Each structure stands twice: as C-alpha cells, then as structure tokens.
Curated annotation (Swiss-Prot):
Residues 691-700 have a biased composition (Acidic residues). Phosphorylated at a conserved motif involving Ser-664, Ser-668 and Ser-671. This phosphorylation plays a critical role for efficient TAG mobilization. Phosphorylation deficiency at this motif increases the enzyme activity and consequently induces de novo formation of phosphatidic acid. It comes from Saccharomyces cerevisiae (strain ATCC 204508 / S288c). GO terms for biological process: CDP-diacylglycerol biosynthetic process; phospholipid biosynthetic process; regulation of triglyceride metabolic process. The keyword tRNA processing does not apply. Keywords: Acyltransferase, Endoplasmic reticulum, Lipid biosynthesis, Lipid droplet, Lipid metabolism, Membrane, Phospholipid biosynthesis, Phospholipid metabolism, Phosphoprotein, Transferase, Transmembrane, Transmembrane helix. This is Glycerol-3-phosphate O-acyltransferase 2. Residues 56-442, 474-501, 553-743 are cytoplasmic.
Amino acid sequence: MSAPAADHNAAKPIPHVPQASRRYKNSYNGFVYNIHTWLYDVSVFLFNILFTIFFREIKVRGAYNVPEVGVPTILVCAPHANQFIDPALVMSQTRLLKTSAGKSRSRMPCFVTAESSFKKRFISFFGHAMGGIPVPRIQDNLKPVDENLEIYAPDLKNHPEIIKGRSKNPQTTPVNFTKRFSAKSLLGLPDYLSNAQIKEIPDDETIILSSPFRTSKSKVVELLTNGTNFKYAEKIDNTETFQSVFDHLHTKGCVGIFPEGGSHDRPSLLPIKAGVAIMALGAVAADPTMKVAVVPCGLHYFHRNKFRSRAVLEYGEPIVVDGKYGEMYKDSPRETVSKLLKKITNSLFSVTENAPDYDTLMVIQAARRLYQPVKVRLPLPAIVEINRRLLFGYSKFKDDPRIIHLKKLVYDYNRKLDSVGLKDHQVMQLKTTKLEALRCFVTLIVRLIKFSVFAILSLPGSILFTPIFIICRVYSEKKAKEGLKKSLVKIKGTDLLATWKLIVALILAPILYVTYSILLIILARKQHYCRIWVPSNNAFIQFVYFYALLVFTTYSSLKTGEIGVDLFKSLRPLFVSIVYPGKKIEEIQTTRKNLSLELTAVCNDLGPLVFPDYDKLATEIFSKRDGYDVSSDAESSISRMSVQSRSRSSSIHSIGSLASNALSRVNSRGSLTDIPIFSDAKQGQWKSEGETSEDEDEFDEKNPAIVQTARSSDLNKENSRNTNISSKIASLVRQKREHEKKE
C-alpha cells in the first residue's frame, strides 16, 4: 500500500489519499533532458517514420487544448481500436506538437500499460523507453485449478450467481473453497469463454458471484450444467500503479490511459472504470495546491487495419480537477469519484464516434455523404465532427417516423450501390448521353495507360517488399485469431491487424534489406559489368550504397503505386458509364438526388433542436458548392464551433454504466488496493461491427497525382453550455442502460 498523507484538517491519516512524493525524479515532465528523455525522443522519431509510411495522412485537431509544460495532465484516450498503435500514435503526435502548437505544448505522455505487454520483449523495450507504467490485470493471471476439481451451477436458470464445487477424488483433493479462494478474485471457464468475480464464499463447496457467467453461448450453458474444470486468479493490488501515477502528476508530468482496458473492434466505447477519476482526485487530495488537467483524446481511423489509411487525433476541452475536488474526495470519495467519472465519460463522448451497431454506422456515414454537396471536399476533422453530430441526432430521434423511414431508404440505397459495385461519391460522376459515353471511353483509355505506367514503376519495390507483405498478412491474421479467442469483447479481432503488421515489418524489413544488400555485394564482386554502377570496391561503402538504393527504390515504388491505386479506383465509374444502360444510371442518380433532398429537409428540421449552432454549420460548410475546396474554411469553422458549442455526440446505445460498479469499492475507509484501472471489458448488447469508409476513396480519386489556466469569462460561459449538452448525453446513456438491464 501507498504511504498515507496527513490530512490538513484532521490528525488521522486517510487511507485512500496517497503520499505526495517530492523525491521522485520524473524524466518526462519537460523540465529535464537526460538519457531517458533522449530514448523517448528516439522512439518518437522511429514511430513517426513508421506512421509516415503506414498512414497516408494524420490530422491533429484541438492541439490548443493540450496544457502547457508544467501542468499535471492526464490524457484519457478512446476508443482503443488499434492495440499498440493507439498509444504510440498519441505519444508521438503529442510530443510533436512543438511543430504545430508551440514548444510549450510538447508533452511526453507516459501510458498506463497492461503488465502482460511488458512480458513481450519487443513491446517491453519501447514501453520502458517511453516511461510506461505497468498495471496488473486480473484476467491475465488466470491459471488452471487442480483438474480433479469442477464447478457447476445447480440452478442456472433461476440463480446463475450460485456456483457449487465438487471433487473427482474427495479423499486426495477436497474442495475446500474457503481455503483455496478469496473474495474479489476471478473465476474463468475453459477456452476463455467467460469470467466472473467472486463476491463471497459462504462454505467450502459454494461460491457466490458478483455477476453470473455470460450464458449467451450454448457451450457455457453446457459446461455449467454438466460441470467443468476452471481457472482462478487471485485479486490484484493496484496500489503501486496508482502511486506511480501520483508521482508523475506531483512532478508535473503527463500520464496517458485507455480506460476501456484492452483494445477492441466494436463501434462504440466499452464501459469506463473509476481508476482514471481516482488518479486525478488522489493527486489533488494529497496536494491541494495543484491542479490536474484531464484531457479527453479521441482517435478516429479510416480503414484502421489497412496500409496507407488515414487517422485523426482530437484533443477535447480539459477538465480541471483542483483542491476543491480533493477536499470533496476526502469527505465523500464515492460520490466525488462518481461525479468526476461522469464528466470524464461525457468528455470522451465529445471526441469519439459511437454507434449502436455496424448497420447504423454505415447508414450514418452514407447519410453524411448524402447531406454533403456532391463536389465539396471536406477535411477529415470536419467529416469526423459531422458524423458525430449525425450519430447524436440519430440517438435522440431514432423513434421518429421520418428517421425510421430515412434509415430504410438509405439502407436500400446502399444495397443498390453494392449490387452495381459503385460508391456513393461515384454516382453523380456517371454519364448517360452518347457523347459523354465517348468522352468516358477516351478518358478510360488514357487512365488505363497511366495506370499501366505507374504499375510498372511500382513493380521493383513491390517485388522487393512482397515477402514482408505476405508474412505481415499471415502473422497478423494469426494474432487476430488468437486475440479473438482470448477476448470477451472483440468481434473480428481487426484491432490487432495493423499493430502486428507494423511490428512484423519493423523487424523483418531491416533483416530482408540487409540480406538483399549482401547478395548485391556478392553479385557486384563476381560480375565485372556491375562495377559500372557500383561506386567503390570497399565492402562497407557498397553495403551502405545498396541498402540506401533499395530503400529509395521501395519508397519510390510506394509513392508511384499509391497514384496507380488512385487511378485504378477511378476506372469503375468510367466503365459503368460506358457499359450500363442510361436509364439504370439515371434511376440511381434520381434516387440519390431525392434521398439527398429528403435527408437535408429532415436535418434542417431536427438539427436546430439538438445543436444551437446548426444553422451556422450548414451555412459555412455546405453553402460552398461546385468544386470549391472548403478544406481550410471548413476546418477553421469546425474548430471554432468545437470550442463554442461541442456536439457531444455519441450513440448512447452501448456505452457502459456511467456510475461504474467500481465505485462501490471507494469509501472513506477504503484503500487503492483493488480499484479497477481498466475496464473489465464485459460483453454488452452490441450486435455486430465492421469498418468501411468511402472518404479515402473520394479524396484519392479527386486527387490522383489545458487550455491556458486563465480563460476569459466568455469562454467559461461557453464551457457551461457544453456541460449542459454533455448532461443531456449522460441522461440518455443512463436511460439506455436502465432499459438494457430491464431487458
């Protein structure tokens, strides 16, 4: 346990208030530069190279919300959709803010990371280099119990929380639950089917669970009915982790955390646990003179698991936790944690997109494209903001007959496009007259020639990199299957694909290119004609020369191949214009026009009821038509409106309970021993998930070649209005969760 700090108002120490350590040396607070800081910067440099190659574009939004160096900060990040890429992206982009937002905002977040990740040698190296704070997770410690012991549910239908035990050989292996196990520990079924926490152990053969095993799978029902072997993990002590976080904050550092816990591929956030709130409250309770800024950070990926995709990183408005919160935490910890946790959850809604299921997400994205004027190109941050607002509007009016009707029409329209093989942004590009068809034919031939040229130019690098492409794909899919088997919340395991592609490429690429270089040196020494293009007979110089040449060839092929792929994507609408009957094309275009008009009318009617600045958004962004590039105007407009009246959009449908059951563990006599830091990641009421976006294709085809401590009173008023919007979301969340519980 952490050493208790003396309460200023009472002589008796308070267990849940940590010690404010003044002797802790923090190499990552921005005030010192040593070997640890240098390793951090080297890691950021490497990550930046990797992300420049893997992502086509990374946009950072709301950089002004990141507190300056010297302000204790917690970056609360969500959704955790790309395993190790997520924290690496946040760390690198936050450190690189010195180039866009000034050196004073260049922070070095140290992430709270699952202890199991530090057991992976490659991940452990970067984890230690970047000041990672390990946290044990109870589910990672599950181990098989004696095979002679079995558990079963005597009345699974009426009392699923009551678990009985029996022994195959009572003489040599007695059950003895009271001696073997303890409350707040974890039981697990075979093959990672389900886990459940122990509430109490009334006798040697009975266990009462805090919540029953999930019985959605028939295999679980079969095992609990007939009896099964099981796994067990002793309750964990998070005191050391909390103290490490407090030490970072007390020395004016920056801590990062994904409060959902492990990564997942669901379309909405997992429940947020109380640990993140206790980190901020414990720090200010120990030192009432300090203020902690809790900054929400949202990550948005367009095709997250694909090479050359796009990403948007968004920092939201900070929540300032001060000494007043600390005093409240000392007097009534549970209520204070609940209050702050709600604020943090609301703030995460403001920077993330949340849909109840995959179909709704696809409909919302299609609705945004239909609402957006055909030839207007919006920047990625604007697309993210509009998607978020549409999701929130849908959540509020989903039972409105007009919304139900529109959802069906949009869904049918998407199916029609799928049958033709078109994307929405390609529909209005289709031509119907004979003259236009002739022009399309000529354009098709020209683009085919260009595509062939770029394909040939990209061949050398593609051939060189083919072994890595193949191994990356095979190994990442293998890891995704393994992760899916172990996880209780993943759907397809797509959150693991990009991470393992990058890790495998990072390890294999240097090995492969060293091998290529050595082979070329041997070839140059044996073949005399090769000396024409080899600069020297020195083996080291030859190695450097060949290695650089191979890297340059691969990178050149990457860039030319990228243009070739964009050209290839633009061929389909030309082909459809030539081959498909004009009436069928006109029918699809008419359907789109009518659907766009109806959708716009409904948005214009309902939008102002949800967002006070709706008219301003529509006027400033969508009044620009006919090919006008509104990237700069729209981005600045969206940024201003994000500060003035953020939409706080969320799907509301599948977010976990705001008042986490972890709060019951916080009381005036409690400690930090078993407070959960990460979400339990229990499976909710989600239906399905996937991820597709036309925005990359649309951009590609059209282009083939703490807020400062002292804020003004006006901004305080705006923040108050933001809080009102967040409260509406919180209310909807609670209503939805209560409804799910009743079901």
